[in-house]
């Protein structure tokens, strides 16, 4: 399965119904919630990302969020960018935590590891490059040891069908962990990364993707098969600006990834490529 066949289901109306919310999540492995985050807080984080790209010489200082562009994702110091984006303050804001606890139905702990993404459009590029994106994978393959965390992905500016985002294989979490093999088409830090072969994602596990607005959340199970969709926006030409973290019940064990900022992992020269990407020590490369 490689092509998107449908939209996420809007689960926002289920927030007041514990049984219905949990039932949908158990069956489909994700929740798509619209306009549940403080949009002013989201815009503040988006502006911080813009300011970081400007400060590092990658973007026009006069560009608005809608006009912003950079030459390439890889031309920007990924570790340095984390100094500009105050994501921990956003995730742990009382209004954000309230939403997380509505989802879980209990107190939560937000991982100290956050990934930020700022992908320019490749539409019309003579030599488009998508190898920094992620192939089909499951976060639970690399992050643990407990698997009761959920990945929370948010756009910082609007996304369209063309500007990319996350494609989910509906219900794929129910088959548990799958084999991940090296994929030379996707590389980070100069090395190929592991992913799930598309042939291992069933036709019955329909691939879903929808446009999103600031204030929306896409969250999914540790075993959800998902992948990046490239940014090919051209009318308008938009950056894909987003960030994601993991959240788990406060009572659960807190593993390495939960307690270690991504930047600390990335700076550790002793770690292999997947450890740098996920923040989790691993022998699997």
UniProtKB/Swiss-Prot annotation:
Residues binding 2-oxoglutarate are: 137-139, 153, 228, 240
The misc remark on file is: S.avermitilis does not produce pentalenolactone itself in vivo but instead a group of new metabolites that are neopentalenolactone derivatives.
The record lists Fe cation as bound by 137, 139, 226
Organism classification: Bacteria, Bacillati, Actinomycetota, Actinomycetes, Kitasatosporales
Query: What EC identifiers does the entry list?
Result: 1.14.11.35
User: What function does the entry list?
Assistant: Catalyzes the conversion of 1-deoxypentalenic acid to 11-beta-hydroxy-1-deoxypentalenic acid in the biosynthesis of neopentalenolactone antibiotic.
Gene that produces this protein: ptlH
Family classification: Belongs to the PhyH family.
Cofactor(s) recorded for this entry are: Fe cation; L-ascorbate
Write down the chemical reaction(s) this protein catalyses: 1-deoxypentalenate + 2-oxoglutarate + O2 = 1-deoxy-11beta-hydroxypentalenate + succinate + CO2
Q: How does activity depend on pH?
A: Optimum pH is 6.0.
**What GO molecular function terms would the record report?**
2-oxoglutarate-dependent dioxygenase activity; iron ion binding; L-ascorbic acid binding
Any keyword Metal-binding?
A: yes
Q: Name one GO biological process term.
A: lactone biosynthetic process
Q: What is this protein called?
A: 1-deoxypentalenic acid 11-beta-hydroxylase
State whether keyword Zinc-finger applies.
no
Locate the residues binding substrate: 117, 188
Q: By its UniProt entry, which PANTHER family does this protein fall under?
A: PHYTANOYL-COA DIOXYGENASE, PHYTANOYL-COA DIOXYGENASE DOMAIN CONTAINING 1
Pathway note: Antibiotic biosynthesis; neopentalenolactone biosynthesis
